[in-house]
């Protein structure tokens, strides 16, 4: 049962094309039957979007999303395409999923791991930076004013910022909750990065608010080897990376914290044969701890350019016919945004990739977190759109247009009012979201208790209207019920999964099944 709602020959071909990276085949199939993009798993364990994201096929991921694939669809284990892209380090796929407004806070059914846990486990710092982009606002100028661009000249408008001009809201507590979200056993993303010795990833997480004193829980089975109640310093000591231990100590981690087994970090180091860490972790040690600068991967302009790309489009930027208006980086597309401060102009795609690939190890003029301008080497804190930028936007998928209950209505926005019976039979499950058909075996996991509507108070779901203008009551819950569901989901986000099955045979078997299907 579950998501396996049946299959067809064209569905099998789409799965194979998504797995093998055959963009021509995938495009042909979706042109013949666009509803294929909204199917869930075609009788398997993963959707075509999962296959394409795990393999890093950016063109197929983009094609599926434009054709209406649910960006937050889950597989048999409750994992999203974003988790697969982060697990395999495909940061360009992560970036594309973020442009289609995927939900980064979702956790899988097995252990409560988010995409941030998957990225931190392997030290994929670019993926970590992308996942946190919506939680880190582009800082304003020192005088509290922001600049806009008019006719190529930089002007100052007080009381306005790039984030406020797009109607964005920033919630610091949401960032701290997400970055410190514990998985099964209380393991955070910082624990995972510390255990595997990923210094750059740890530094970025700490700079953005990761708790260096977070402890694992006395229940759960993910941390039995080191012990419950362990801090990231215990994990770094077990991993054996001296630089990671120094970083944690410089940020306030304590050498005297005992875990539930009564072990200090130095005891964990001895158990794992890390004797070279004893002078550093000894409670009586007087060894000097270096002071660390902010992370080289901190990119404050990310939020501004990411939301400009969402609103004004990234994929459909036309080439410029005027050489004077060409982007100085790619020399192909017309300039659409300007760097705040130096006012140099770029196309949206180049500005986005400047933030995605920035690794400021060279000297430049700018505050921490700014990225160097490729033309003048001055620091860029945010981007602003040019007045002449056309509002094209990304082609919305059904997952962005409707919440899950509204997707039960099989009539698409772009489809005609009258639909033949044959088309109804062919597309009878096309609009059913995977969230509505959860596998029965996932019910014991707390993380599977998801609300059926993702609409917020500021962006309610639009009611579907009939041809005569009268509203048709959509099958979404009442406003009070939706608020209660959102509150319940937030409680589920804060509460870790204590299923005790993260490393159990059943959970591992389910995850191995999904991974084996992708790697086949």
Swiss-Prot record:
The keyword Transport does not apply. It comes from the Eukaryota. Pathway: Protein modification; protein ubiquitination. Residues 467-479 have a biased composition (Polar residues). Residues 467-493 are annotated as: Disordered. PROSITE patterns: ANK_REP_REGION, ANK_REPEAT, ZF_RING_1, ZF_RING_2. Keywords: ANK repeat, Metal-binding, Repeat, Transferase, Ubl conjugation pathway, Zinc, Zinc-finger. It catalyses: S-ubiquitinyl-[E2 ubiquitin-conjugating enzyme]-L-cysteine + [acceptor protein]-L-lysine = [E2 ubiquitin-conjugating enzyme]-L-cysteine + N(6)-ubiquitinyl-[acceptor protein]-L-lysine. A zinc finger (RING-type) spans 327-377. GO terms for biological process: protein ubiquitination. It is an enzyme of class 2 (transferase). One of its GO terms (molecular function) is transferase activity. ANK repeats lie at residues 44-73, 77-106, 111-140, 185-214, 228-258. Pfam families: Ank, Ank_2, RING_XB3-XBAT31. The keyword ATP-binding does not apply. Its EC number is 2.3.2.27. Residues 484-493 have a biased composition (Basic and acidic residues). This is Probable E3 ubiquitin-protein ligase XBOS33. The gene is XBOS33.
């Amino acid at each position: 049962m579950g998501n396996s709602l049946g299959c067809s020959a064209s569905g099998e071909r789409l799965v194979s094309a998504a797995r093998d990276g055959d963009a021509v085949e995938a495009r042909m199939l979706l042109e013949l039957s666009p509803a294929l993009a909204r199917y869930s798993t075609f009788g398997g364990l993963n959707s075509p979007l999962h296959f394409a994201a795990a393999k890093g096929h950016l063109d197929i991921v983009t094609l599926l999303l434009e054709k209406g694939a649910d960006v937050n669809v889950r597989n048999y284990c409750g994992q999203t395409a974003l988790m697969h892209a982060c697990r395999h380090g495909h940061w360009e796929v992560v970036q594309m999923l973020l442009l289609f407004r995927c939900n980064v806070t979702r956790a899988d059914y097995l252990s409560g791991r988010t995409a941030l846990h998957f990225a931190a486990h392997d030290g994929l710092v670019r993926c970590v930076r992308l996942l946190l982009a919506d939680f880190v606002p582009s800082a304003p100028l020192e005088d509290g004013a922001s600049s806009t661009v008019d006719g190529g000249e930089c002007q100052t408008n007080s009381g306005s910022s790039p984030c406020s001009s797009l109607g964005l809201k920033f919630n610091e507590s949401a960032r701290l909750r997400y970055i410190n979200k514990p998985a099964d056993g209380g393991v955070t993303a910082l624990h995972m990065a510390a255990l595997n010795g990923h210094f750059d990833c740890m530094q970025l997480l700490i700079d953005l608010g990761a708790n260096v004193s977070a402890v694992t829980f006395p229940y759960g089975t993910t941390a039995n080897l080191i012990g419950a109640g362990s801090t990231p310093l215990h994990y770094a000591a077990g991993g054996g990376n001296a630089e990671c231990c120094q970083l944690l100590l410089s940020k306030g981690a304590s050498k005297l914290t005992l875990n539930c087994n009564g072990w200090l970090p130095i005891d964990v180091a001895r158990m794992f044969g890390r004797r070279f860490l004893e002078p550093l972790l000894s409670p009586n040690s007087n060894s000097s701890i270096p002071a660390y600068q902010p992370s080289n991967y901190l990119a404050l302009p990310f939020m501004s350019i990411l939301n400009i790309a969402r609103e004004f489009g990234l994929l459909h930027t036309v080439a410029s016919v005027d050489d004077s208006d060409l982007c100085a980086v790619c020399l192909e597309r017309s300039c659409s945004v300007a760097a705040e401060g130096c006012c140099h102009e770029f196309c949206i795609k180049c500005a986005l990739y400047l933030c995605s690939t920035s690794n400021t190890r060279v000297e430049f003029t700018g505050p921490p977190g700014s990225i160097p301008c490729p033309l003048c080497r001055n620091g860029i804190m945010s981007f602003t759109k040019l007045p002449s930028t056309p509002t094209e936007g990304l082609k919305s998928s059904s997952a962005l247009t409707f919440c899950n209950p509204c997707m039960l209505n099989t009539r698409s926005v772009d489809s005609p009012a009258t639909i033949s019976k044959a088309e109804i039979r062919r597309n009878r499950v096309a609009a059913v979201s995977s969230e509505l058909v959860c596998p029965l075996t996932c019910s014991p996991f707390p993380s599977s208790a998801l609300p059926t509507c993702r609409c917020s108070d500021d962006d309610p779901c639009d009611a579907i209207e009939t041809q005569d203008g009268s509203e048709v009551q959509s099958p979404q819950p009442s406003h009070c019920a939706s608020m209660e569901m959102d509150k319940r989901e937030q409680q589920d986000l804060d509460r870790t999964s204590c299923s005790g099955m993260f490393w159990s045979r059943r959970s591992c078997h389910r995850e191995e099944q999904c991974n084996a299907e992708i790697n086949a």
